[in-house]
Regions:
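N-terminal membrane-targeting/anchoring modules of bacterial envelope and secretion proteins
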Residues: 79, 106-107, 169-171, 275, ...
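Boundary/entry segment of secreted carbohydrate-active catalytic domains
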Residues: 22-41, 45-57, 218, 298-315, ...
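C-terminal domain-boundary segment and adjacent tail
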Residues: 36-37, 111-112, 157-251
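Secretory targeting signatures
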Residues: 1-27, 338-372
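Metal-dependent polysaccharide deacetylase catalytic core of the NodB/CE4 family, i.e.
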Residues: 24-130, 148-153
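C-terminal beta-sandwich/jelly-roll accessory domains of carbohydrate-active enzymes
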Residues: 208-360
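A short, acidic, amphipathic alpha-helical segment used as a generic capping/interface helix at domain edges
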Residues: 134-144
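Extracellular beta-rich ligand/substrate-recognition surface
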Residues: 131-132, 217
Length: 372
């Protein structure tokens, strides 16, 4: 009986060891989907790549991950079609300390989110409105979004070992709305560009020329939109001497061109490009109003992928979606199993048949003694 108890304990140890053995973070892994197939596809569609740090590391305690995450991302992809350097950073929920904010800014980031409290020390803060997780989406909040606002929607594909499903009802609602699908960086850059139109003086009284002035404070070049009005409709509108393309009224992704409407036109142009309004009469009055939202749409929407350690998993449900994403990339941890586990496994592998043989021999000996 005693020997059977020993054997039982040995078998229990074999079962429990994989569960109780600790794991040790030895190195950091790479997500090669950032540069292979998926990353380039998402970049071409207009998505943005930002940073979230390193998996399992609190950026508020380990400031080194801010710059290291930027460098990790730069090894694999550009941040956007509008600029190579990442400018969006995912900060843990709650207040931001001045030290953390300064480190984020010095690393080249200018936007943080998305549940920030208090002062951001010069960084642009984006606040989360709701989640895209199935059963968690606030449909009323999506329906009641303010005009010209940026609606930021949280998305995570996996929580530990649990796969998260998207809310298809929320996605259907977004597709039906009069909204611009964009990203954090694109939205802020577009807004700043729209506020930077300047009237360029020329020696032609039948023409008015405007241009977005480029800023030295940003590493991105994002087109901006303004609504132009005039006392007389122009004969033609040109970009750098070429007829400006027409943007359809239902266009929900950023393009350059014009969208004529009654009384004026929405003009979206890249920084540095001249916009020429050609009139039949001389000295026509032209005014412009900056637009936060592209193409005269009601408001803007960006879905934000948080803690993205595997781009394949995070994008798998959105291959043909019109939604645009801000992917906050997190360098994944590479887990190394405790060295004691394989050593113990080998020992058990050797000891188990010996123990079984010994138990059988002991039982046979006991049986012989009983019959005698």
């Amino acid at each position: 009986m005693h020997t059977r108890r020993v054997l039982g304990l040995l078998i229990c140890s074999i079962i429990l060891l994989p569960i109780t053995a600790p794991t040790v973070v030895a190195e950091w892994d790479d997500d090669n989907w950032l540069r292979n197939i998926i990353g380039p596809e998402r970049l071409e569609l207009g998505d943005e790549f930002g940073c979230h740090g390193f998996e399992g590391v609190d950026v508020r305690e380990e400031l080194w991950v801010i710059e290291e995450c930027r460098d990790y991302l730069n090894r694999f992809t550009d941040a956007s079609r509008c600029g190579s350097q990442p400018i969006s950073f995912g900060h843990p929920n709650g207040p931001v300390t001045e030290n953390v904010a300064n480190t984020i800014s010095e690393a080249g980031f200018s936007i943080i989110g998305d549940r920030i409290e208090g002062d951001t020390y010069g960084l642009h803060a984006v606040q989360r409105l709701t989640s895209l997780e199935k059963g968690q989406a606030n449909i009323s909040a999506l329906e009641d979004a303010e005009q010209d606002s940026l609606v930021s929607i949280y998305w995570i594909a996996r929580w530990y070992d649990v796969n998260i499903r998207e809310d298809k009802g929320a996605i259907s609602l977004l597709r039906s709305q009069d909204v611009w699908f964009t990203t954090w960086g694109e939205w802020h850059g577009h807004k700043e560009s729209g506020e930077s139109f300047e009237n360029i003086l020329i020696n032609d009284s039948n023409m008015k020329t405007f241009r977005i002035s480029t800023s030295e404070q940003t590493s991105w070049e994002v087109p901006g939109t303004a609504f132009f009005e005039w006392s007389e409709a122009p004969l033609n509108i040109q970009f750098d001497g070429q007829d400006a393309p027409i943007i359809p009224s239902d266009q929900k992704h950023l393009l350059t061109g014009i969208r004529p409407v009654e009384g004026g036109a929405f003009v979206t142009v890249a920084p540095g490009v001249s916009v020429d309004f050609i009139f039949e009469s001389e000295n026509v009055s032209v005014t412009h109003t900056p637009q936060s939202t592209f193409n005269g749409l009601h408001h803007s929407v960006s879905v934000v992928g948080h803690h993205v350690t595997n781009l394949h998993d995070w994008t798998s449900d959105f291959h043909n979606s019109p939604l645009r994403f801000t992917w906050l990339i997190e360098r994944p941890a590479s887990l190394e199993v405790d060295w004691r586990l394989p050593v113990f496994a080998v020992a058990v592998l050797i000891a188990t048949p010996i123990a079984i043989k010994w138990v059988i021999a002991r039982d046979q000996e006991d049986n012989e003694q009983w019959w005698n």
